Amino acid sequence: MNNAPHLYFAWQQLVEKSQLMLRLATEEQWDELITSEMAYVNAVQEIAHLTEEVAPSTTMQEQLRPMLRLILDNESKVKQLLQIRMDELAKLVGQSSVQKSVLSAYGDQGGFVLAPQDNLF
């Protein structure tokens, strides 16, 4: 069975999904990125299934190589953008924790307002 056209089409679809994920990450559309990830994973599994059935010829491998490079480059860029986002979120969580600690320590002073006073001596 010659699945070369189907395999090539599956790789083209994977490239499109990869480019979509990169665009979503670049535009900081994180919810949409997460949603699109499942379609990407399914496309990768489809390609794995197709290549298990029949190994691609050397010619087909040469045709697919640029697509694979593009996909790997896109994936690397998406990972970098995700790491930046994770760092931003960690910073926000840290700030939130500090604010919570400050409020917890100083927020409840038994109804008294703490204010500097003049020295009475």
Curated annotation (Swiss-Prot):
InterPro entries: FliT (IPR008622). It is found in: Cytoplasm, Cytosol. Residues 60-98 are annotated as: FliD binding. Residues 1-50 are annotated as: Required for homodimerization. One of its GO terms (biological process) is protein folding. Homodimer. Interacts with FliD and FlhC. Belongs to the FliT family. This is Flagellar protein FliT. It comes from Escherichia coli (strain 55989 / EAEC).
